Amino acid sequence: MQDQRHRFVLSGLYIAPGAVQISSIVTIASGRPYNILAGADLNGDGDGGTASPDRARLNPASEASSIGRNTGVMPYQANVDIRVSRRFRLSGKTGVEGLFEVFNLFNRTNFVEVNNIFGTAAYPANPLPTFGQFTQAAAPLQVQIAAKITF
C-alpha cells in the first residue's frame, strides 16, 4: 500500500424489528502514492526508469530533473458496502439465513493503477500521451443474494 496518509473505516450493525440485521462498512482513504518512471535505463544499471536506487530522472541531461520516490498521488478512494440478513430457525440449532449484500453501493469508480511511465527509451524527456492515465479500477457495484444453512 506504500505511504497512504489517511484511512477512515467505519462499520456498524443495526438490528431492526423482526430480527433483521443491517450492517455496513464505510471506507474513505487518501490517494496512494506511486513512483514516476522515466521509461528508459538512464544509468545503465539494468533497471529501466531509475536514475539511482532512490530517484527517477525525467531528463537524462539534467541532474536537477530527478524526482523522489512516491511523487505521484492517486485520487482518494471511497466505498460503502451494506448487508441485510435474517435468520430463520428451522428446528433446534438448525436454521437458514437469508442474505442480501451490496458492494460499492454508490458505484463509485476507485482507481487503483495508473500509467506511471513518463517517456520512452528513445525520448525519455518527452512525456507519453498515456502518462498519468488510469489503467485499472476497483470492482463496480455488485449485488449478491445468498442463503446460509447453519446447524
Residue spans for each PLM region:
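Short, solvent-exposed micro-motifs at the edges of structured domains
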Residues: 1-151
